[in-house]
From Swiss-Prot:
Name this protein carries in UniProt: Taste receptor type 1 member 3
Entry similarity comment: Belongs to the G-protein coupled receptor 3 family. TAS1R subfamily.
One GO molecular-function entry: sweet taste receptor activity
GO cellular component, one term: Golgi apparatus
Positions bearing carbohydrate: N85, N130, N264, N285, N380, N411, N432, N475
N-terminal signal peptide: 1-20
Species this chain originates from: Pan troglodytes (Chimpanzee)
Chain's role: Putative taste receptor. TAS1R1/TAS1R3 responds to the umami taste stimulus (the taste of monosodium glutamate). TAS1R2/TAS1R3 recognizes diverse natural and synthetic sweeteners. TAS1R3 is essential for the recognition and response to the disaccharide trehalose. Sequence differences within and between species can significantly influence the selectivity and specificity of taste responses.
Gene label: TAS1R3
Amino acid sequence: MLGPAVLGLSLWALLHPGTGAPLCLSQQLRMKGDYVLGGLFPLGEAEEAGLRSRTRPSSPVCTRFSSNGLLWALAMKMAVEEINNKSDLLPGLRLGYDLFDTCSEPVVAMKPSLVFLAKAGSRDIAAYCNYTQYQPRVLAVIGPHSSELAMVTGKFFSFFLMPQVSYGASMELLSARETFPSFFRTVPSDRVQLTAAAELLQEFGWNWVAALGSDDEYGRQGLSIFSALAAARGICIAHEGLVPLPRADDSRLGKVQDVLHQVNQSSVQVVLLFASVHAAHALFNYSISSRLSPKVWVASEAWLTSDLVMGLPGMAQMGTVLGFLQRGAQLHEFPQYVKTHLALAADPAFCSALGEREQGLEEDVVGQRCPQCDCITLQNVSAGLNHHQTFSVYAAVYSVAQALHNTLQCNASGCPAQDPVKPWQLLENMYNLTFHAGGLMLRFDSSGNVDMEYDLKLWVWQGSVPRLHDVGRFNGSLRTERLKIRWHTSDNQKPVSRCSRQCQEGQVRRVKGFHSCCYDCVDCEAGSYRQNPDDIACTFCGQDEWSPERSTRCFRRRSRFLAWGEPAVLLLLLLLSLALGLVLAALGLFIHHRDSPLVQASGGPLACFGLVCLGLVCLSVLLFPGQPSPARCLAQQPLSHLPLTGCLSTLFLQAAEIFVESELPLSWADRLSGCLRGPWAWLVVLLAMLVEVALCTWYLVAFPPEVVTDWHMLPTEALVHCRTRSWVSFGLAHATNATLAFLCFLGTFLVRSQPGRYNRARGLTFAMLAYFITWVSFVPLLANVQVVLRPAVQMGALLLCVLGILAAFHLPRCYLLMWQPGLNTPEFFLGGGPGDAQGRNDGDTGNQGKHE
């Protein structure tokens, strides 16, 4: 703690601030301790002219003052004093500090780095084969602030395995443990920040962007990381370039100017600028003078809070600025700490109280530490009192203190006495270290990084200077508050930065040129769908699925077959009822009048058998509707053809009898007529049916029909049907019936009817005509109709065939039986005498044939 005298002086200084006399702030950048921490801070900036004209290994002059660098140095000073005043981390020990100016230049930063590594109490770095017992002047180094400097000092300190904790260097390359084994940082790596930036672009649908980076290691590596992250998220970089540093030659300046003109003339509305402060300042300075149209600028952390960039005249017209800023704990006591020390530094009594001290050995090497720090006021530094990076400095000091606590095995009573800790011994306890700072628990991962949240910041202009407003947060995933964002557009609408419009539902991208973000939208055809919004090709549905045009999903195919409830089937069932009813009615009449001349002339029992066969044909129709099964497919053709063969064989016997009686001589007629009735007639029927059985058996064995599911016939359904494997065998199965029908037609077509007798030939002729018309029409209709309706076509053909035979042959006889019974005589049907009801059945077949 500060002593009572110092506290009194502090109170006096606050009540009676200095009157502009030189401060003694530069004298407070060094303090002795048991263990000393080195500090590298950008207290000033070197003149560009001095850097360009440097021809000797001398240091450039640092003239310009950096308020942020001084505040960060004071944050380290405050953290060390806090630790010394506590009794939990290093009880009984005091930390010291040795803070130097880097001038934001590697050339300048190397000198204090050499001082840090000099042997304690000297300015020399001796050459040894083994530095295990080497004790440098400092135990660890806090800083530097930039990746450019850390790349230089990091390798240097890593050779001696001296822990170095940066509070601002964020390059991903510094995570390489092989190259930088002793490097740590209290800020996340650039990869985290760039991941957040890529998520931001994806969140707002910006996939056509420009990416610019400063022409240094920081910018080049940042662009490389962003390119990979953008490609993985489908973000296209339309224009890419490096922004030269202020001292670059004209050729490099011309290249970035060309890139800016291309961006201005293209549809790109979003620019990622991953650059250092000076490069960003140079870029915006040129953009303002060139009147670049307003864009959305995604800023890197390096220039997002830069007063140098914010204060550019005309910067408000450059558009919307968004960027991610590391979130740390608030150091509420820090502003008061700064005010107190500035007031004390302005008090002559306090400066005198510091006492006379010897000039440090390093003063001859690096010169006065910060002469410009003795000429500032509170107003010069007030803008950066709440700078986000201040906490990173504070946390860096606490990380080293915690590692030293662990190395010394300190406890509440103190730290056990032992030999001074070497830097490499401290380093062993830095890996995967967990420590507390400002109420937060932090941890170094295996690469020496800490995991911290980012706040999404928006520049909101208030007068000539923007203020940073929180509009989101990133902690592995992005959360934005869109309503808080004020866009630069006139209607405050989110800018659109796309090469092509967003494809609609069910459309995929057909890429044009080299960029995947430039494309035409193509509709997905039926049977395919768009799986993801970024698809470049439609995904085909499975064979059991279907989809309409421009679909985003597939639907399960429903099985399609000739169902019982379909209108065509219901109509055919009505037709079946009619046909079956007529068959049963005719059969009943024939059985009732079985001994009458009309029934005997029609064949008697054979006529009844023919009607039974027609009834079975009607019933076989019921095998066609419904879901196909292997048994149904095998039974359909035989069970429909065999009964029809039985019916046609009885009609063939009628036709043969008529032909024999009408066209052959009486001797032949008498001999053959007996064979066409009685047992021989049944033998003919049996032979015909056996032939049909043989053909059907061959059809079923050689080419058995099978149940198949056709996934392509119907657009939205799976067609389940009985597939005919051979249409030739299918036709041969009809051969017996066709032959019988043809013989019937030939036997009756040219037969002359006798006056006064019933014309039996005419009915048979028209019955066969009905058969042929039905089945001849069936062939082209079956070939052209949809497969799902083919069973209905065959059902219709069978029923029409039955109805044709009934209408032409049986129904006229039923009409005579019911309404003209007077014609039911032997003379009219059989040609016998009055009362001869049996006619030819009495054995007088030959003579009756002659009377006909």
